[in-house]
Design a protein with these regions (language model features):
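A penicillin-recognizing enzyme superfamily signal
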Residues: 1-170
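Ser/Thr/Gly/Pro-rich low-complexity, disordered linker/stalk segments of secreted
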Residues: 162-187
């Protein structure tokens, strides 16, 4: 049963929460997101989300949120059952959950005014090199926008991209950023 007198505590810093929000926005807004284009049409409010499946598409999930609500949709059976027996392979790849989530969110937010996610002090937006994952250097041919905690920025990329490899000195100084401290938003 649920207790209504539980003690709460903050699990994430506001900075980490904001970076995760930016990362999960890509699921809906990026052209390679697993739920691309399925954000609710709610006065232009941003959304974030995460798709999920159990082994062999036996359970399908989508969890998403806006500045007002966070909701989850689960599609499955009490006993494990291959969803591709009743849904097409395309539908079984969480699209059914995503579409249900979108329809629900559009209804519950239909009359709500626009609201933005709060920004967080201590988070900065920077270009990063899509080949190395480091902050973009002068010679990086492919860049995207990322969000980082200001106190935990990755090094700047100094790869020799023409050869496709980093020098020994580059490799020694290069560390891929901690995913919990890094937000990624592709152009």
């Amino acid at each position: 049963y649920l207790e209504n007198n539980a003690t709460s505590y903050q699990a994430l810093t506001p900075q980490t929460a904001y970076v995760m929000n930016r990362l999960l926005k890509n699921v809906l807004y990026s052209n390679v997101g697993t739920a691309r284009g399925n954000y609710p049409n709610s006065s232009g409010m941003e959304s974030f989300g995460k798709t999920g499946t159990a082994s062999d598409e036996r359970d399908l999930w989508f969890v998403g949120g806006t500045p007002y609500y966070v909701t989850a949709v689960w599609w499955g059976y009490d006993a494990p059952y291959d969803m591709t027996n009743t849904l097409s392979k395309d539908q079984a790849k969480t699209k059914t959950c995503v579409k249900a989530w979108k329809a629900y969110m559009e209804q519950v937010q239909a009359d709500l005014p626009y609201k933005a996610f709060p920004t967080s002090d201590g988070v900065v937006e920077r270009a990063y090199c899509t080949q190395s994952g480091l902050l973009a250097g002068a010679n990086c041919p492919s860049r995207a926008t990322g969000y980082y905690r200001a106190d935990d920025l990755p090094d700047t990329c100094n790869y020799s991209h023409s050869s496709g490899a980093a020098s020994a000195a580059d490799t020694q100084a290069t560390q891929i950023p901690d995913p919990a401290a890094t937000g990624v938003e592709t152009d």
